[in-house]
Amino acid sequence: MKLLPWIFSVLFALPLYSQAAGGNSVVSVDLPIPAPEWTLPAIENAEGDLSLSDFRGKITYVDFWASWCGPCRLSLPALNALNSQFADDPVQFLAISIDVVEEDAWDFLKRYAVDYPVVIDTEGDIARTFAVDGMPSGYLLDGQGRVREIHIGFKRGDELKLAESIKRLLSDMATSEVDET
């Protein structure tokens, strides 16, 4: 099974999260892990189905959230601000609702608008594949679709850490493009 090594890698990284100094909610992945492919129906800011492969070539932040998640009320507006900050860069934000009832996700989005694509995983299959363990959970992917960081939970200031990580990946991307020429 192709996903088995990926799942074991993520499970290996999660204990590092609990050991992070000062309650830091970010786990850096030293050896980038290819993210599993998925396809889910869009419910906001996109039409039809979206797949991870739609975002290849862009740094992508995949954010798992739910309507019952308290910290998601802070994280989604913060991610909107980052989406605006990086609008001119090859950066994409994507929200994946894990609500079982689609109407719950819609009600939440009416109160906490999101400016980037939102898809829904009512069966929880993709969340299980990513080994999501806590809400919200975010996965920062490089342009090749590899997981570079795992973010678990959200508190004020986490968006600043995420912005720095995105800038670092943008710099790496620019450097690799120069090296290829």
Where does each model-flagged region fall?
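N-terminal "domain-start" segment that seeds a small globular fold
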Residues: 21-52
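Thiol/disulfide oxidoreductase modules built on the thioredoxin-like
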Residues: 107-115, 122-167
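Conserved redox-active cysteine motifs that mediate thiol-disulfide chemistry
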Residues: 64-81
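Bacterial N-terminal signal peptides
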Residues: 6-15
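Thiol-based oxidoreductase modules, predominantly thioredoxin-like and allied folds used
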Residues: 90-103, 114-123
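Non-globular targeting/processing and membrane-anchoring segments
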Residues: 172-181
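Short pre-active-site segment immediately N-terminal to redox-active cysteine/selenocysteine motifs
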Residues: 58-60, 64-68, 134
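Positively charged n-region of N-terminal signal peptides that target proteins for export
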Residues: 1-5
